[in-house]
Curated annotation (Swiss-Prot):
Organism: Synechococcus sp. (strain CC9902)
One Pfam family cited in the UniProt record for this chain: PsbJ
Keywords on record: Membrane, Photosynthesis, Photosystem II, Reaction center, Thylakoid, Transmembrane, Transmembrane helix
Region (Disordered): 1-20
Protein name: Photosystem II reaction center protein J
Top-level taxon: Bacteria
Name of the coding gene: psbJ
Amino acid sequence: MSSKKSLYPDGRIPDRLPDGRPAVAWRSRWTEGVLPLWLVATAGGMAVFFVVGLFFFGAYTGVGSA
C-alpha cells in the first residue's frame, strides 16, 4: 500500500497534482501497482476466443466429424 494520505473518503489517491501534472510518472504506471483492467480484460478475451476456437477446430477435424 502507499503511504500517501488519501484525500477521498473511499481511500483513493488523486491522479493529478494541484498544478495539473500527473501524480505518478508514466513509466511508473507500468511497473508499479496493479495491472490496468483493460489489459486484463483484453488478455482474458483473447484466451476465451482461443479456447472456443479450439472447440470448433476439434469438432471440425476430430472425433465425430463424419
